Regions:
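Glycine-rich phosphate/pyrophosphate-binding loop and the adjoining helix
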Residues: 66-156
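Helix-loop-strand module that forms the ligand-binding subsite of alpha/beta enzymes
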Residues: 1-72, 138, 142-150
């Protein structure tokens, strides 16, 4: 979750996402992420929720997360106590609906074609000597050969 800050995530969220940059598919992805779901939530007094959620969703995609939910809400306030009850009720309803979907899909998410294509492209870079440390990780996992992180591992 991140409040909108100049149409993007806050500095602390950006630092968190950057800290895990080494887990991007190009480097050393955690195979359990290929079986998870993620939620991006952003709030703003005005606008910018879409681009803020995209910042977070991009990292989830490159971590291999197959299902990402996004929820942005204009709260028209700068503190929780100033949010109108009608908006709070809508948030409650929307997030309950999202939670239901997450529970329903738990253990059943599948890696999509876009992620698989991206993975194969990253694999091609590694087989051409992209980075020694990353290649050693991929090789240890068998991903430079026939194994794939979304197969035979529920990782939950």
């Amino acid at each position: 979750e991140s409040p909108v800050y100049v149409y993007h995530v806050t500095g602390s969220m950006k630092a968190f996402l950057d800290h895990y940059g080494y887990r991007w598919m190009l480097h050393r992805p955690e195979e359990s992420m290929f079986h998870k779901q993620a939620v991006c939530i952003s709030t703003a007094a005005g606008a910018g929720m879409k681009s803020t959620n995209k910042d977070m969703a991009d990292s989830f995609f490159y971590w291999g997360v197959p299902k990402v939910y996004k929820y942005g809400v204009r709260v028209m306030a700068t503190s929780y106590k100033d949010i109108k009850p009608k908006i709070k009720a809508k948030i409650e309803k929307d997030t309950n609906k999202m939670a239901y979907q997450i529970k329903k899909n738990a253990g059943h998410v599948k890696t999509g074609i876009k992620t698989k294509i991206c993975f194969y492209f990253m694999r091609m870079l590694h087989t051409r000597g992209w980075d020694e440390a990353d290649l050693a990780y991929w090789s240890k996992k068998g991903w430079d050969r026939e194994k794939r992180p979304w197969k035979n591992n529920k990782g939950v």
